[in-house]
Structures are given as C-alpha cells and as structure tokens.
Amino acid sequence: MISGDTILFALMVVTGVNMIRYLTALRSLIYIMREAHPLLYQQVDGNGFFTTHGNVTKQVRLFHYIKSKEYHHHHDEIFTGKCERVRELFVLSTALLGVTLLAAFIL
C-alpha cells in the first residue's frame, strides 16, 4: 500500500510544477502585454512586476483584470489566449495548493 508521505510528496511535486507553469505563463503574458496592451502594461508596472520592489496594488490590478475577464473585449487573439491560459493555470494551482494543504493536515 502507498504511504501517506508518498502521496503528500507526489501532491507537492505536482503543485510545484503547476505553480512554475503558472508563473511562466504570467511572465509571457506580461511580455506580450507590452505590445498588445501598453496601457495595462503600465498600470500593472510591467517592468517591476517580478521584482522585490513591485507594487502589490498594481499586481492586484492585473488579478482583477483577469478575474473579471476584461480581456474578452481585446482585439489581439494571442493576448486573450495568454490571459485565458494564465487564468486557468491560476485556478488549477490554487486548487492543487488547497488539496495539498488539506492532505498535509489529514495525513
């Protein structure tokens, strides 16, 4: 039988990989945003988004933009596709993190 530690370790690995996928997709979205939506790029502090001095309120602005699906009105299909991918990966990563934390407390 598979031990609880093995299950928890596997969940942690899967969660970690999906978090890396999410951050990579977010980085590519911000790169594409520079050309496709310069105003939003400036509003979310595109240059300083992943730095230690990044403005959290500007990062929350991007979260709300993607959460409310405002990108559906954009003309660039690549940009809307990246936004959709980031949104899906965020939901997946959040769910996996919740399941992993739940499993850590149960096991």
Curated annotation (Swiss-Prot):
- Keyword annotations from UniProtKB, A to Z: Cell inner membrane, Cell membrane, Membrane, Transmembrane, Transmembrane helix
Main localization category: membrane
Q: This protein is called what?
A: Universal stress protein B homolog
List where the protein spans the membrane. Answer: 6-26, 86-106
Transmembrane as a keyword?
A: yes
What InterPro entries has UniProt attached to this entry? Universal_stress_protein_B
Q: Name one GO cellular component term.
A: plasma membrane
Localization per record: Cell inner membrane
Q: Which family does it belong to?
A: Belongs to the universal stress protein B family.
